[in-house]
Amino acid sequence: MLALLTAGCADPEAARRLDANIESMNERIKQAQEELNTYGKGTVVHDLIALRIAIHQQTLAMLEQRRAAQQWRTTLIYTVDGTPYAAPADLAARVAALQGRLKNARDGRESDLQLMRGSADSVRPLYITSIATKTVQIAQLEYQLAAHTNGFPPYYVPVSAPAKSATPQAPAGKPATAR
């Protein structure tokens, strides 16, 4: 359930920051989509990049919704499990903790990038997978940080339902066979 209330004038500096965040998120999505094309569909790295794109798209939608609310001078009130969402009392501490975790995740990814550059070809796939995994973690932390700093509940909801199993179910009492 979403309630709309009329509010006063929007802060121009907040609007500029929000526009910069939206532009940055669009760039991240574009970069990730280009990166996605370099890996075959169904590979672990391809799927990790696709997950990162989905997280970025949700973050972008959240930021665009906040920007539209500012432009129309509307206050959005969110409910979680039937209860109006309110920012936690320790919001500043949570934001600081998220910023620390984000810095650590970025440092870890950078470390893996450096190690990969000096590694033998035989171990590069391991570093690529590790880097892709850490980049998903970074996207998740960025989403949480954007949610906290823009007044959204920091929950991630998948964009689409999970794919159904490609393996057919065997009738009761019969073994499953591959076709």
Give the ranges of each region predicted by the language model.
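C-terminal motif of bacterial Sec signal peptides marking the signal peptidase cleavage site
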Residues: 5-8
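Bacterial signal peptide processing site
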Residues: 10-12
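Post-signal peptide N-terminal segment of mature Sec-exported envelope proteins
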Residues: 14-42, 47
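Short, charged, amphipathic alpha-helical segments
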Residues: 19-20, 45-58, 122-142
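Amphipathic alpha-helical coiled-coil segments
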Residues: 32-36, 54-77, 103-110, 134-152
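Charged, low-complexity interaction regions
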Residues: 36-49, 75, 111-128, 149-151, ...
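Extended alpha-helical coiled-coil "stalk/arm" regions
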Residues: 40-94
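Compositionally biased, proline/threonine/alanine/serine-rich low-complexity intrinsically disordered stretches
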Residues: 96, 149-179
